């Protein structure tokens, strides 16, 4: 059995991954113990491949499901049904998170955006009091799918849907609901690149230069000295006449007194 496990692990390209062989072997042995009274309608190849699938999920490494399906000798529906049964027998009924899905499908570059969308969905669900169980894996799956769409990352729906536990028609309906939610509530947060920042800085510098030149343009030209001199003399004479008139008025009042 150990030799067969090693052969299949190697064929799946997991031989160099740390702890996969050990974890797969552990799950195969545990499955044999717990399935004593539960007849499993599956061959040894399928059993080992499914345990390797579960082991990869637990460790958090990518797993090629298409290659696994070929090696297992099972139809897709049989593969998925047996996987769910194994999860129950092995107490592995953990709900798939955004990170789990991204890791298993090799979509780590969209994980941050998917988490952002998941947080948005939870906020909208709480605000609108929808009574939604946001822990259901369909929502984490849809968050990853929509993140791929927004970031223009190609992903196959057929690879995502098994995580959601939805039928194709249900998945399509959920997809439409999320697209409406994103259109209404989601705002793209763009981190400016160094090129954008340089362009903005140059634009600000140009605006400052233009503003300085405009101020210079509005500044009146320097007054000719002779004109200034005449204006100052006229102003002084007017002030002197005003003082003389005021003094004359005061003298008249004193004489009358």
UniProtKB/Swiss-Prot annotation:
Extract the ranges annotated as region (Disordered).
186-222
Q: Which UniProt keywords apply?
A: DNA replication, DNA-binding, Nucleus
Q: Does the keyword Nucleus apply?
A: yes
From the Swiss-Prot or TrEMBL record, state where the protein is found.
Nucleus
Source organism, top-level taxon: Eukaryota
One Pfam family of this protein, by short name? ORC6_2nd
Basic and acidic residues: which segments have biased composition? Answer: 197-222
What InterPro entries does this protein's entry cite? ORC6_cyclin-like_2nd, ORC6_cyclin_first, ORC6_met/pln
GO terms, biological process: DNA replication; DNA replication initiation; mitotic cell cycle; septin cytoskeleton organization
| Molecular function in Gene Ontology | DNA binding; GTPase activator activity; protein homodimerization activity
Q: Which GO terms describe its cellular component?
A: nuclear origin of replication recognition complex; nucleus; origin recognition complex; plasma membrane; septin cytoskeleton
Functional description taken from the UniProt entry: Component of the origin recognition complex (ORC) that binds origins of replication. DNA-binding is ATP-dependent, however specific DNA sequences that define origins of replication have not been identified so far. ORC is required to assemble the pre-replication complex necessary to initiate DNA replication.
Tell me how this protein assembles. Answer: ORC is composed of six subunits.
Concerning its family, UniProt says: Belongs to the ORC6 family.
Q: What is this protein called?
A: Origin recognition complex subunit 6
In its UniProt entry, the species of origin is given as Drosophila melanogaster (Fruit fly)
